[in-house]
From Swiss-Prot:
<dbReference type="GO" id="GO:0005736">
    <property type="term" value="C:RNA polymerase I complex"/>
</dbReference>
<dbReference type="InterPro" id="IPR022905">
    <property type="entry name" value="Rpo11-like"/>
</dbReference>
<protein>
    <recommendedName>
        <fullName>DNA-directed RNA polymerases I and III subunit RPAC2</fullName>
    </recommendedName>
</protein>
<dbReference type="Pfam" id="PF13656">
    <property type="entry name" value="RNA_pol_L_2"/>
</dbReference>
<keyword id="KW-0240">DNA-directed RNA polymerase</keyword>
<dbReference type="GO" id="GO:0003899">
    <property type="term" value="F:DNA-directed RNA polymerase activity"/>
</dbReference>
<dbReference type="GO" id="GO:0003677">
    <property type="term" value="F:DNA binding"/>
</dbReference>
<comment type="subunit">
    <text>Component of the RNA polymerase I (Pol I) and RNA polymerase III (Pol III) complexes consisting of at least 13 and 17 subunits, respectively.</text>
</comment>
<dbReference type="InterPro" id="IPR008193">
    <property type="entry name" value="RNA_pol_Rpb11_13-16kDa_CS"/>
</dbReference>
<dbReference type="GO" id="GO:0006362">
    <property type="term" value="P:transcription elongation by RNA polymerase I"/>
</dbReference>
<dbReference type="GO" id="GO:0046983">
    <property type="term" value="F:protein dimerization activity"/>
</dbReference>
<dbReference type="GO" id="GO:0006383">
    <property type="term" value="P:transcription by RNA polymerase III"/>
</dbReference>
<comment type="similarity">
    <text>Belongs to the archaeal Rpo11/eukaryotic RPB11/RPC19 RNA polymerase subunit family.</text>
</comment>
<dbReference type="GO" id="GO:0005666">
    <property type="term" value="C:RNA polymerase III complex"/>
</dbReference>
<dbReference type="InterPro" id="IPR009025">
    <property type="entry name" value="RBP11-like_dimer"/>
</dbReference>
<keyword id="KW-0539">Nucleus</keyword>
<comment type="function">
    <text>DNA-dependent RNA polymerase catalyzes the transcription of DNA into RNA using the four ribonucleoside triphosphates as substrates. Common core component of RNA polymerases I and III which synthesize ribosomal RNA precursors and small RNAs, such as 5S rRNA and tRNAs, respectively.</text>
</comment>
Amino acid sequence: MAAETERKTTLEMVQAQGNEESCVTFVLHEEDHTLGNSLRYMVMKNPEVEFCGYSITHPSETKINFRIQTRNGIPAVEPFRRGLNELVDVCQHVLNTFETSIKEYKEQKEAAME
């Protein structure tokens, strides 16, 4: 029962020396290259981001070290959050397009059978 109530940490924030908010490493647990590379792409589209990269420390670990460094003192949390939101939007668009295509295919198939 205790295992059910325990909640694993899925995201940690590790700040660089000097407690500067513009240079942060986010540790994402239970994730791999699928999220890492997609999120890196979305974050790098932001012109305020100076550096963005990720690493997986060991092949047997399921965590990503995701680092963001911004320009002009902008907190790294902002482009991280924006990148996640944009990635969700892209995934939602792909899902909607896929579902629409499936629906159209089924309608065409039914029309051809009549």
